[in-house]
Regions:
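Fungal secretory targeting signals
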Residues: 1-18
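N-terminal cap/lid segment of alpha/beta-hydrolase-fold proteins
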Residues: 19-83
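Short, surface-exposed "cap/lid" segments of acyl-processing enzymes
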Residues: 78-124
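Alpha/beta-hydrolase active-site loop
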Residues: 141-167
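Alpha/beta-hydrolase-fold enzymes
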Residues: 186-271
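Short beta-strand/loop motif that positions the catalytic acidic residue
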Residues: 292, 298-300
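Conserved alpha/beta-hydrolase "acid-adjacent" motif
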Residues: 301, 305-316, 342
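Catalytic active-site module of serine/aspartate enzymes centered on a nucleophile-bearing elbow/loop
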Residues: 327-363
Length: 363
């Protein structure tokens, strides 16, 4: 996967546009913005491919464009000198937006952002291109993993340089945290531009067979977003998908008793989208990142059957081979959790696991 990274001259704090605070971020310590970036990548040719008949993909389609990315910056609510120069940058998985890391429902339990801020960390929650208030480009030919990687690299560059609205200077340490699809994107980031972050945390993720195979979008509870009966999706082009209903959304959860039904209902009411292009190139970044030298942590839920086929989740032990020069490679299995670790009753313990790891590694 070859990616060319170019920063648009106007993509700075001056060019970024602050927008009204939504309920989950309407706090004195938070600023929500739309940040323009220019990204270029070599995408995959998906023309004429049948997702029911997977075939190897070929990257030979140059793509370049200007995209707007929704970001939420929150300053610490407690002063901790040890963490003053550290920024945590989080991104959500498929069909999620910035709410995933900062849930307004029972935030004392389900908001990683609030907990991190209370422990002295600054946070930047970003919506992938294609979800939230970010740009929604062609969902098949443009919105694929390579362009997502390129766009995220640009945001991380701006973040490190202190050029995001709300920032009061540069950050010496940047910790990237992804969930699911955004973990795949984060892996691509440390393959292509390992210098933009100092530590990588992957959640709801594991390296798949890197054979560049199409991901079947049929039969997994996904439907065209513009047919979901949701007003905010009505005018989206064909190729944007979302989950069909609350029942299909339970695939992201563990068995009953591991989550609050009110959280699932909130999740269904505020779900977002994913593109066919993202799905069909999901596994293309499942490659080694030999140039990344920071610490790596992978965390999965014991009930996440996609990455933990057994309760022991022993498949995570093989993750170390993909980061041969990392300072350290660790993995943690959260018992009692499914794929969406943030939305289970075990969320507080999971969040503290991440923060304790970050502190232990000197950030």
């Amino acid at each position: 996967m070859r990616i060319s990274l170019g920063l648009l001259a106007t993509a700075s704090a001056a060019a970024a546009r602050s927008i009204p605070h939504p309920p989950q971020s309407g706090r004195a310590n938070c600023v929500q913005s739309l940040v323009p970036v220019h990204a270029s990548a070599t995408n995959f040719n998906l023309t004429g491919l049948d997702p029911t008949k997977p075939v190897p993909l070929k990257a030979d389609v140059p793509v370049s464009g200007r995209f707007t990315v929704e970001v939420h910056f929150c300053a610490p609510t407690a002063r901790r000198a040890a963490h003053a120069d550290t920024l945590l940058v989080m991104a959500p998985g498929a069909t999620y937006n910035t709410l995933y890391w900062d849930l307004p429902l029972q935030p004392e339990t389900y908001s990683f952002v609030r907990l991190a801020n209370s422990q002295g960390f600054a946070t930047l929650s970003i919506a992938r291109v294609g979800d939230g208030l970010s740009s929604r480009p062609d969902p098949i030919n443009v919105l694929q993993l390579p362009i997502q990687v390129a766009a995220q690299v640009e945001i991380l560059k701006l973040a490190r340089e202190g050029k995001i609205p709300g920032f009061r200077g540069r950050f010496r340490n940047v910790v990237g945290i992804g969930h699911s699809l955004s973990s795949a994107i984060l892996n691509g980031v440390i393959v292509e531009a390992p210098q933009v972050i100092d530590a990588a945390i992957f959640t709801g993720y594991g390296h798949a067979d890197p054979s560049n195979m199409l991901f079947p979008t049929t039969g997994f509870g996904f439907i065209p977003a513009n047919e979901a009966g949701i007003p905010r999706f009505r005018n989206l082009p064909d190729g944007y998908l979302t989950t069909q209903n609350i029942t299909s959304r339970t695939v992201f959860y563990g068995p009953p008793g591991t989550f609050d039904p009110d959280v699932l209902a909130f999740d269904e009411a505020h779900k977002d989208t994913v593109s066919i292009g993202e799905f069909n190139t999901l596994f293309t970044s499942s490659v080694a990142a030999p140039r990344f030298r920071g610490p790596v942590l992978t965390v999965d839920g014991a009930f996440d059957t996609s990455f933990c086929p057994t309760q022991a989740c022993d498949t995570l032990a093989r993750e170390a081979q993909f980061y041969p020069n990392a300072r350290s490679v660790e993995f943690v299995v959260i018992q009692g959790s499914g794929h969406d670790l943030n939305l289970h009753l075990t969320a507080p313990g999971f969040f503290q696991t991440l923060l304790s790891w970050i502190v232990r590694h000197g950030f």
